[in-house]
A protein has these predicted regions:
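Conserved helix-turn-beta segment immediately C-terminal to the redox Cys motif
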Residues: 25-26, 34-63, 82-86
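Non-catalytic, surface beta->alpha helical segment in thiol-disulfide oxidoreductase systems
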Residues: 161-183
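Short loop/turn microsegments at loop-to-beta-strand junctions
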Residues: 4-5, 27, 148-150
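Thiol-based oxidoreductase modules, predominantly thioredoxin-like and allied folds used
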Residues: 53-74, 89-100
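N-terminal "domain-start" segment that seeds a small globular fold
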Residues: 1-20, 38
Length: 184
């Protein structure tokens, strides 16, 4: 059976990054965009990184332009935007697809480990659902990523333990991260 440690992704400079480097760490895997209504979640992610990085938290940031073209810049421009506006200190990887024919193999795996369970209730969830159907859907896989800032949470043993949609509470997500960080 595969684990996240079997995968590589590209760094922004095009070199390979092996997820084996994350063995024994808690990992947040997130597809991001700079022009999205959820982009301010970078602030919450950076706070988590600052709080827990020394205790073994890593963030795998995969910029993605598949959802309404909300990450249009080059890898360098995206990195500059994030460091300037959100003071991000965690590394960003190469902009990549998370759905469809060119999706990262890592994302194909993640979607088998944590299925899509819905966007939740409320106006944001309805808006994201409509936007996905009109501007983001690239396949008929019901477990595809539905928008930017979908987060997968991986425990220290490499198990993909949760999937959080961008419409879900960041407070609930932070509690889940805290619980994993405190687990031995």
């Amino acid at each position: 059976m595969a684990s996240i440690y079997d995968f590589t992704v590209k760094n922004a400079d095009g070199s390979d990054f092996s997820l084996k480097d994350y063995e024994g760490k808690v990992v947040i895997i997130v597809n991001t965009a700079t022009g999205c209504g959820f982009t301010p979640q970078y602030e919450d992610l950076e706070k988590l990184y600052e709080k827990y990085h020394d205790k073994g938290l890593e963030i795998l940031d995969i910029p993605c332009n598949q959802f309404a073209g909300q990450a249009p810049g080059s890898d360098e421009e995206i990195h500059s935007f994030c460091t300037l506006h959100y003071h991000t200190s965690f590394p960003q990887r190469k902009k990549s697809d998370v759905n469809g024919a060119n999706e990262l193999p890592l994302y194909a795996y993640l979607k088998t480990q944590q299925k899509f369970k819905g966007l939740g209730k409320g106006l944001k969830a309805k808006m994201v659902g409509m936007a996905y159907k009109s501007k983001g859907k690239v396949s008929d896989n019901p477990d595809d990523i539905h928008w930017n800032f979908t987060k997968f949470l991986v425990d220290r043993q490499g198990n993909v333990v949760a999937r959080y949609e961008p419409t879900q509470s960041m407070k609930d997500f932070e509690e889940a991260v805290k619980t994993l960080m405190e687990a031995k």
